[in-house]
Amino acid sequence: MRLPWRRASSGERLVVSWSGQALVYVLATGAGNDFTIVRSGVELQGADSLEDFSRRLVQLGLKGYVTDVMLRPEQYQLLQIEAPAVAPEELRSAARYQIKEMVDVHLDDLTIDVLKVGDGQGRAASQLFVVAANNAVVRDVMSLASVLQWDVRVIDVQDMAQRNLQSIEEPERATCALMISEGRQTLLTISAGTELYYSRRLDLPEGFMGMTWTAGSLAQQAPVDAYTPVEEYVPGYAAVGYGGEFSTSGATPASAEQSDIDRAQRLLVEVQRSIDLWERTWTNLPLAGVRVAAGERSEELAQWLSRDTGQAVGVLHTGASFKGLDQISVADMPLCLPLLGVLLRNEVRKA
């Protein structure tokens, strides 16, 4: 089954994700790069049956909209393959065959689509992204859409939504984006010229958003005119994984806070690895900076990564394209923010 693509529409648009019994939604008006948020929210199904949950959503006024759906990273795989030497109309079938050893379900159980890597020129011309979603995931989404009489125009993925958001401020330059919400994974993307070149899921320690990431006392001891390379934090780090004695201090943690700091360094290491790989691979596209989003802790995350990676790290801002952001609660923003990127999509494909 081919992922649908958006057609022109007007009026209010609903963007949703439906994963882990949580419906996240944003209702907006507008077009292009100028939107106004009408309302938003996060609704948990809990112990309700689908019928009862749908009734609750109807009572919230979420029935009958033109709707875009975004799949969360846990609902699909984004694979990168060598572009098969076939005609454009045969790309999907050829890509389906190539990924058979990269997925753990039967190919007949997958919905796939193919996307070019970057601008499709030079080094990027030999690569393709393949989106692979289990048919059961798509059916689950469309079942809810049917009950609520949504006119689903597109099913998008978070990688592409994140690309759209990070391209708002500096669309032509290469930028890295990291968006963190509650959960055990975060998504890191690198885009340039409004095109996605690199995407990677990074594991997070359990409870990451509530952990202590850095210690003020340690920061005060650091030289003010330099940053400490990541390698000094992780003397036992190896490419094959983390050892059981992973620690930033080289000694047994003295407190729960220090234990949190040690575990948080794993994210720092993986961010640095991704940046290093980018700089080695795409020498013609120097990284202009990193943009992060982590709800109320966005500024803290930006300062931490800026100090310890030496990159220009700032908070991801979307205000230029979206009015009414105060309609999204602080608590809901980490989950709702990626949905805004779906509103910015401008790909148009022929049926």
Predicted regions and their residues:
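Hydrophobic/aromatic-enriched cytosolic interaction surfaces used to assemble or bind macromolecules
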Residues: 1-351
